[in-house]
């Protein structure tokens, strides 16, 4: 993927916003990258891969742990399965999973994609905190079930499906890693954090995904352009129409966020949304527990990424207000 670099000062206040956040969270390095009107207009890196004095500097090929931003790749794999006619969003998940549990009978793939399934794991047992389609809750079990459905129905792992795209886009700084290497940042976190885990799996079903800032931005650009890159339609545009359009059931309360295929999609601003209120309808975003954020604003032909090597938030830090400010600052720059 070839993009011209035309750096400008239009988004300097966004860089300042990300630098301020990097000072508030427990990180040793960060970056920001913006594509606007098909040009790279902002690209900045600062800090080091870890807190060690001799740590590698954050740079173009530095790969950040993206945490839940990995769900954008899982969402793509599910959309691929839908586009291939292998599954439907309103299929009950029991059609594909041999889990003998009465609470799953009315849970659909749509519910998993939009965090409206109501499922959770408690002491290793599957429970349901609300009837599928009636509320919204961010739980990891939905992602596990989606990756299983992808593997069962396509015969491929999430990683195998998206690797086909990575090859077409010539991505070399995106992947799931069972072993660390010098280009991967150290993830700074509290000792014993229960939300942190590592994995040897490289199937795309676990949290061990690392991506460079520039390739994450280009992944967003791939979505913005609905797969049409350098005059070539890499994959069917229908995949992106599925991924980035609102899929949430209309039975949930208006205070809850609206989702596409795991992406947060802007409709009306809601109390629990991670998208800033200034962002127009149709904008879509995904945020990781490391603070890594990928935002696409189709109305303004813009993709923005921020990345940090922290994990979780310090006490008193309002991560939702912070990520909304990131998006709202971008809009202020666009409209000023």
UniProtKB/Swiss-Prot annotation:
<dbReference type="Pfam" id="PF00144">
    <property type="entry name" value="Beta-lactamase"/>
</dbReference>
<dbReference type="InterPro" id="IPR001466">
    <property type="entry name" value="Beta-lactam-related"/>
</dbReference>
<dbReference type="InterPro" id="IPR012338">
    <property type="entry name" value="Beta-lactam/transpept-like"/>
</dbReference>
<protein>
    <recommendedName>
        <fullName>Uncharacterized protein BpOF4_21049</fullName>
    </recommendedName>
</protein>
<dbReference type="InterPro" id="IPR050789">
    <property type="entry name" value="Diverse_Enzym_Activities"/>
</dbReference>
<keyword id="KW-0614">Plasmid</keyword>
